[in-house]
């Protein structure tokens, strides 16, 4: 395919246009009370998306000018990386990247050496990152969670309370999932054991009529992706379980009517204590779910791919749990012992999830990556043995989906804050690093210019927050920097200047550090771009047309 090549100044100028367009769209979302951005849904007939999340805005923008779109793509990448690694700071990273790229562009226009310029920027960023870590405050868990969550959710204090409950229940690195709820208010469900959304196959399994639950004690667990066709295949196993004084929970791909009738007849008569449910997972994902469950309960998954047969299963193959509670909609296993094998699988899944999050846009199918990551996260929740489900409430679907994004960001921000500490929020956290840059000596004028670019970038988030509040950004920066208190800043909620640290308005130090590092990295890519190579799209309606192929398929390739 033919190529178009765009060189040097022209390439950088058009890329800079794309950076400016995307940044101007995302910048209103910076701050606790910033306005929202309305995005047309890509599917006709569906309501628009209202968001106050920078990465959502960034991902929605694709420009017609393909060179300008490459510039916008740089900011989409930095926002996506921030969202994956820190959960918050996506708009902050966009603001920093835009400022650094803009100042680089000006410096190159007056003849600055790009290598020395980048060296100065890299040295300054490394020094600021080190200083952020040194200044970070690691306070009590409750205060940090409530403060960081309030900032990340744009001022919703109730979210912080529920996140605190969730993390108290499952731990900082425990399994917390954020899901759309069915009510106006947010709800938190903490689940002990292993749970999946498949209930009993017949109401005749119910043992508690008042609550419509089937409850089993001292449970043996049969896990299989095979279909149970004949009740006779289960009889030896049921007899062995009964002799051992236990009950049997059958989690299978499907239980045929003939086998189900035999189970129900003996269960109702009290001959055996047994309940049949559909196994967790779907399709080709089910074997992995069953292997997880087997590792957790100390049993063995009976899998078709391994050539396993139901009539050869013994008591030693079954998993063990203290109690099973089965409703019409879901199955919960309680009192799971856990094993070394389950802990090893859990660590492996966490590593795999991090690898998926680290993938950049364009690496594989975006939809495929999302589905794989969701499946891995669901398996992590199951293997954790205890999980918290945060159900997001709202009046409309649009509101719930917009809040869900912010609450997911808040959760990841809280975890980041507990890992590396916090600094005053509202853009003030960066200002404390200005003195260390003043002490940084440059080797030449262009390196000094690079250090100066980072120094001026540190004030940019605060300036934008001031402008988003209807004030003069420069005046806000000047007033904050003139104050002796390093925690002094502008509180958008109250519309006043105050000690942000004392008021509990914080940003996670990890978020600030990553935002600056990622912004400088992507701006460095822009700085060192000397040429852009593009494919020239073929607009010929008959491109790739083959008469033989058309005749064989009787299809018009232009349709």
UniProtKB/Swiss-Prot annotation:
Its EC number is 5.6.1.7. One of its GO terms (cellular component) is cytoplasm. One of its GO terms (biological process) is protein refolding. Pfam families: Cpn60_TCP1. Gene3D superfamilies: GroEL (3.50.7.10), GroEL-like equatorial domain (1.10.560.10), TCP-1-like chaperonin intermediate domain (3.30.260.10). CDD domains: GroEL. Forms a cylinder of 14 subunits composed of two heptameric rings stacked back-to-back. Interacts with the co-chaperonin GroES. PANTHER family: 60 KDA HEAT SHOCK PROTEIN, MITOCHONDRIAL (PTHR45633). Together with its co-chaperonin GroES, plays an essential role in assisting protein folding. The GroEL-GroES system forms a nano-cage that allows encapsulation of the non-native substrate proteins and provides a physical environment optimized to promote and accelerate protein folding. NCBIfam families: PRK00013.1, PRK12849.1, PRK12850.1, PRK12851.1. Belongs to the chaperonin (HSP60) family. This is Chaperonin GroEL 3.
């Amino acid at each position: 395919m033919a190529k178009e090549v765009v060189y040097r100044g022209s390439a950088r100028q058009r890329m800079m246009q794309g950076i400016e367009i995307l940044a101007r769209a995302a910048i209103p979302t910076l701050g606790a009370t910033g306005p929202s951005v309305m995005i047309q849904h890509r599917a006709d007939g569906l309501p628009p998306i209202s968001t106050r999340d920078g990465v959502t805005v960034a991902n929605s923008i694709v420009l017609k000018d393909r060179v300008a779109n490459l510039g916008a793509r740089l900011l989409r990448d930095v926002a996506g990386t921030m969202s994956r690694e820190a959960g918050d700071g996506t708009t902050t990273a966009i603001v920093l990247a835009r400022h650094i790229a803009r100042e680089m562009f000006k410096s190159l226009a007056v003849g600055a050496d790009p290598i020395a310029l980048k060296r100065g920027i890299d040295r300054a960023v490394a020094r600021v990152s080190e200083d952020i870590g040194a200044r970070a405050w690691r306070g009590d868990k409750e205060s940090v969670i409530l403060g960081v969550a309030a900032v990340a959710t744009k001022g919703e204090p109730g979210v912080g309370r529920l996140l605190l409950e969730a993390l108290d229940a499952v731990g900082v690195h425990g399994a917390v999932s954020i899901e759309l709820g069915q009510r106006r208010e947010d709800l938190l469900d903490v689940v002990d054991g292993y749970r999946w959304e498949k209930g009993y196959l017949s109401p005749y399994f119910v043992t508690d009529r008042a609550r419509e639950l089937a409850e089993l004690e001292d449970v043996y667990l049969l896990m299989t992706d095979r279909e149970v066709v004949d009740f006779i295949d289960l009889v030896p196993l049921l007899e062995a379980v009964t002799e051992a004084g236990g009950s049997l929970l059958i989690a299978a791909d499907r239980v045929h009517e003939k086998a189900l009738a035999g189970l129900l007849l003996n269960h109702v008569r009290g001959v055996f204590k047994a309940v049949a449910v559909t196994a967790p997972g779907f399709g080709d994902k089910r074997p992995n779910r069953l292997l997880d469950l087997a590792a957790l309960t100390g049993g063995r998954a009976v899998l078709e791919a391994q050539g396993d047969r139901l009539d050869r299963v013994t008591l030693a193959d079954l998993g063990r749990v203290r109690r099973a509670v089965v409703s019409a909609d879901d199955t919960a296993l309680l009192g799971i012992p856990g094993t070394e094998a389950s802990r090893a699988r859990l660590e492996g899944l966490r590593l795999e999830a991090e690898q998926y999050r680290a993938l950049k846009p364009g690496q594989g199918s975006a939809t495929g990556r999302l589905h794989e990551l969701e499946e891995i996260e669901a398996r992590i929740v199951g293997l954790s043995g205890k999980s918290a489900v945060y159900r997001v409430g709202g009046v409309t679907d649009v509101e719930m989906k917009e809040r869900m994004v912010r609450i997911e960001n808040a959760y990841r921000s809280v975890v980041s804050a507990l890992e590396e500490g916090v600094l005053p929020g509202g853009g003030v956290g960066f200002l404390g690093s200005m003195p260390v840059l003043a002490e940084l000596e440059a080797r030449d004028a262009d390196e000094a210019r690079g250090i100066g670019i980072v120094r001026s970038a540190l004030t940019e988030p605060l300036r934008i927050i001031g402008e988003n509040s209807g004030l003069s950004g420069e005046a806000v920066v000047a007033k904050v920097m003139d104050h002796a208190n390093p925690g002094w800043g502008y509180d958008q909620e109250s519309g006043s200047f105050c000690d942000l640290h004392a008021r509990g308005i914080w940003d996670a130090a990890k978020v600030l550090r990553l935002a600056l590092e990622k912004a400088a990295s992507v701006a460095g890519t822009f700085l060192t771009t000397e040429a852009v190579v593009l494919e020239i799209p073929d607009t010929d309606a008959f491109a790739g047309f083959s008469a033989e192929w058309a005749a064989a398929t009787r299809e018009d390739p232009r349709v």
